[in-house]
Swiss-Prot record:
GO cellular component, one term: cytosol
GO function terms (MF aspect): aspartate 1-decarboxylase activity
Binding of substrate, residues: T57, G73, A74, A75
InterPro entries for this protein: Asp_de-COase-like_dom_sf, Asp_decarbox
Enzyme class at the top of the EC tree: lyase
PTM: Is synthesized initially as an inactive proenzyme, which is activated by self-cleavage at a specific serine bond to produce a beta-subunit with a hydroxyl group at its C-terminus and an alpha-subunit with a pyruvoyl group at its N-terminus.
Superkingdom classification of source: Bacteria
Organism: Corynebacterium efficiens (strain DSM 44549 / YS-314 / AJ 12310 / JCM 11189 / NBRC 100395)
Protein name: Aspartate 1-decarboxylase
Catalytic activity reported: L-aspartate + H(+) = beta-alanine + CO2
Keywords in alphabetical order: Autocatalytic cleavage, Cytoplasm, Decarboxylase, Lyase, Pantothenate biosynthesis, Pyruvate, Schiff base, Zymogen
Length: 136
């Protein structure tokens, strides 16, 4: 039996562009793609913190150092520039692999620059006002 678990997360990224006239997908700055361990074409879930929208799409790697997070295609009706999003990938693993796996967590600032890397999906950026989901 395989379990589906969190593979990686880019936490609280700011959407920089939304383009209806594109075939589909999400374009993500190459620095963030690499830090999260994502690959071109990989399926991701995008959760909009601002309005609650949730979509599934695939990754297009954008130019490094730009901070770009661009929602392409029909999803641009749901997610807008300036919205805060969480981008998550999932992987399938055996029970033993799943219990040992540590996801790649990428925390970013308002300009989508990496401010912290980690492996605990429930912990906020150290020093932020966000609450840990482990303290609930």
């Amino acid at each position: 039996m395989l379990r589906t678990i969190l593979g990686s997360k880019i936490h609280r990224a700011t959407v920089t562009q939304a383009d209806l006239d594109y075939v589909g997908s999400i374009t993500i700055d190459a620095d963030l793609v690499n830090a999260a361990g994502l690959i071109e074409g990989e399926k991701v879930a995008v959760v909009d913190i601002t309005n609650g929208a949730r979509i599934e799409t695939y990754v297009i790697t954008g130019d490094a150092g730009t901070g770009s997070i661009c929602i392409n295609g029909a999803a641009a009706h749901l997610i807008n520039p300036g919205d805060l999003v969480i981008i998550m990938s999932y992987l399938q693993a055996t029970d033993a692999e799943a219990r040992a796996y540590q996801p790649n967590i990428v925390h970013v600032d308002a300009d989508n620059r990496i401010v912290a890397l980690g492996n605990d999906a429930g912990e906020p950026i150290p020093g932020s006002s966000l609450l840990s989901s482990r303290s609930l």
